[in-house]
Amino acid sequence: MSRTKGRIYSDIAIPPGKILLDSIKALSISQTELARRMDQPIQAINEIIEGKKEITASTAAQLEKVLGTPAYIWLNLERGYRLKKN
C-alpha cells in the first residue's frame, strides 16, 4: 500500500466484481434481481462478479442506473484491476 497526498492506494488488484457483490449485498439485491433490472443474463452478472468478464461502458451505465454508483467509478475500478492484474 502506498500513500500520496493523504490518499491511500492499494498495490493489490481488487476485482470490481468483488465490489459489485459487496454493493448488491448491502442493498439486499440478489444477482438474479440485478440481472433482471439490468436486462442482462444472470451468467453475465456472475462472470463480472467472478472477474471473468470486464465491465464495459454500457454495463457501467446500467450499473449506475440500477445501483446509483456513477459509471466512471465502475470503469476506473475495471481499468485499475486490469492494469494491476497484467
Residue ranges: model-predicted function:
Residues 38-55, 59-64:
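Recognition helix of helix-turn-helix/homeodomain-like DNA-binding domains
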Residues 70-86:
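Short amphipathic recognition helices of helix-turn-helix/homeodomain-type DNA-binding modules
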Residues 26, 37, 66:
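Residues within the alpha-helical elements of helix-turn-helix
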Residues 27, 52, 77-81:
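The DNA-recognition helices of helix-turn-helix-type DNA-binding domains
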Residues 21, 32, 61:
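Residues within the helices of the helix-turn-helix
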Residues 32, 43, 72:
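Key DNA-contact positions within bacterial/archaeal DNA-binding proteins
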Residues 2-29:
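A short, Lys/Arg-rich alpha-helix, primarily the initiator
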